[in-house]
Structure formats: structure tokens, C-alpha cells
Amino acid sequence: MNRQAWTVYGRFQLDRGFRIPDPAQIHWGAPGDAGPGTSVLGAIGGKRLLDLGSGGGHYAAHLARERHAVVDAIDVAPTQHQRALLQYADVPGVRFLLGDAIDHLNRCEPYDLVYSVHGLGYLHPHRSLPALYRGLRPGGRLIFSVLHTDLHRRPPSSSLEPRQLKVQLKGLEPQDVHLWVLAPQLWEDVLTDHDFTVEAIDLLHRHEDDPVIDQLIQARRA
């Protein structure tokens, strides 16, 4: 379901020839919103990073060009992968991968840092977190954003269950997706259960006419 939604979105953007503007920083909530930006990643020059759910590849290319990181960017949707290659294939220091992030993490050389802008919320934590532990070096960092309130203004869940939502992707009919929209304490508990230390959970408010609130979570592998 999730793969299909983002494949449809990627095809729509390819068909209309849309190119993502090169970002000046990472937007962990909605594009263009104020927030901590790229600074939360720290010093990443020469470090190996994984962008999980990389979409059109703009953040991976930005970190490779401007912060001199070595970035693998993985997405499960073939049309999103195609968009990234069309726009950023010639950027040194970034490699675009098509496939399942969990499979990749279970067989890759460990990374220094894994980050995800609204990608991890589409994966069951009991599947993704063991793979992330395997795919990070000891002491490696995991930084990701997820929804705190959903698109219907409902608060986060206190139980580890996904929600079936209709996501409005610009220019398309609403797409069905499964999302884990969890309370901060539940995220901390499940991360701790998988041997991550949570260093910060921040709530990010979007612009005033957007009721959605995001979480930015920073954790470290044991």
C-alpha cells in the first residue's frame, strides 16, 4: 500500500517534469517550515550516511555536495528512485539505491548515521529498529521525523498499532497508506527496547494554517 502510493506520486511528478529545488537545509516537518535544519546531524564530513526513504534524493545530494558526507539514499518506489537519478545521478558522494530499506540494513556495511524525513513512520518499528541496530556502527546515530498528530488532527497513539490514512499528495487523489503515529513516550520505549538511547524528542509545529505537528527524534545505538 505505501509503496504503491509513492510510486503513483513519483509517476505524477515525472510526467509533469517537476524538478525539486535544491534545498539549503533539511526540513524535518513540512517543506519550507522553520526548524533545526541540517545542524542536528552534527559534523558529517567524510561520514557514511543512509537516507531512508529518500524520495527525489534532494537531501542526500545536498549533504554530499554541501556537507561532504558519503550518502547512500534508498527508496522502495521505483518512480521516486528514477526522479532522484534524473536530477542527481552526477553528484559525487551519493549513491541512489532502489529497494527495501530493511533488507539493505541487514546486509550493508554499518553506517555512521541514518536519517529519515518521514520515512520511518511507514515501517513497523519491530521490523525497522532491529535492522537499524544492525546497520549502524556502535555509537552510530539515528535521526528521524514522524507525525505527532495525523492529517485529521488526531493525537498520537499510545499503542503500537498503525493507522490507515488517506494522504493528500499534491495534484493527486488521496492515497491510502499505513502509518505509525506514536506518542513520544512510546517511541522512546520502543527505541530503548531495541538498544537505542533516546537523546532528544522535539515537537515541530508547522505554519499557522497547517494543524499537523511533527516529532524529531534523535537516538544513538548502543
Label each residue range with its predicted role.
Residues 178-195:
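Short alpha-helix
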Residues 1-45, 58, 141-170:
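Conserved class I S-adenosyl-L-methionine
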Residues 106-114:
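A short acidic, Gly/Pro-enriched loop at the edge of an enzyme's catalytic core
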Residues 113-126:
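A short SAM/SAH-binding and catalytic strip from SAM-dependent methyltransferases
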Residues 48-103:
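Class I SAM-dependent methyltransferase SAM/SAH-binding core
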Residues 196, 209-222:
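Core SAM-dependent methyltransferase catalytic element
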Residues 127-138:
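A short glycine-rich, Lys/Arg-flanked "PGG" loop and its adjoining helix->strand segment in the class I
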